Amino acid sequence: MKKLGGFDYSSLEISNRHKMNNKYIRKSIRAFPFGNDELTPEEKLFKNTFEEWYSAKHRTASNDEITFINSITIKNCPYCSSIKFIKDGIQKYKCNDCNRSFTPLTNTIFDSRKIPISEWFEFLLHLFEFHSIKTSSYDNRNAESTGRYWLIKVFEVLKGIQDDVVLDGTIYLDEMYLPKIKSETVKKNGKKLRGISNNKLGVGVATNKDKSIFIVTGTSKPSVTSTLRTYGSHIKEGSTIIHDKEKSHNALVNKLNLVSITYSSKETVGLEDKENPLDPVNNLHNLAKRFIREHGSYDRDNLQDWMNLVWFILNPPNDKYSKVLKFIEIAISSPKRVKYRDSMMKNFTK
């Protein structure tokens, strides 16, 4: 069986251009070093070319997009959830209970949009292909702040996306650890602590090769409490788990009557991937860490939001275009409006 997020997954091919760290790309794409008056032929050609690029990347809503919006089925009022509403114009409705008017996009992340929904397609494709927000914004001719704002919207749509995921059958399970920010790093005698320490953030990862979970443990080291909290509602009773010899996993085995197969680090160290019994979960660790490295300054307080995004990227549908359409579908049906000023009060990433 092909690995989850397997070798054909586009994220494994990250070009050098997505590792840019150039201060000059932070300026607006249309911030030219010359004014609009008395341009030389070269300046005029240069300016018009960039304006054409920008216009191509910032289209107005197409007829297809308008048709799509008009095709959305309204099930209830986005304000009070009442099913008592009437049509009040072309794709405009009025609720009989709360007396408020709304459209198919009201209270979604596309509410009051200034950029067409179609612009999201490229943004999401870049995000799912492990681009950083900085390089994606540059490629899309958008301000970097727009990329950060849209990422926050993605987080809102995906909140709780893993809540109902339950793994069964043979499950590969292991914790993954990510570093805390430098300002919170604990040192001893001027040196960082080694191994699994308070300088790490734990994420519980498990997969049955068809689907997976990425749940923040809330601890630096596994405990009985954190293990049960992390995996307890996501593993079907009676399943088989293949894991390392972490002692806290025993509580999970006992509570859910699991069949336990364990391998110590000494048994797996140095093994080729195909020979390592924990490779299915190790592969997910590697992909998740690779994605996070592209967003190195991410806010650790929102780590579960990042893990929800990782989960969405590495789980079905495996086709990236289908994944984009799946996200749009979820976003349209989710009453989660995100206001720019409120969301940008705090930086989530760079």
Regions found by a protein language model. Name each.
Residues K2-K350:
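Residue-level recognition of single "structural anchor" positions
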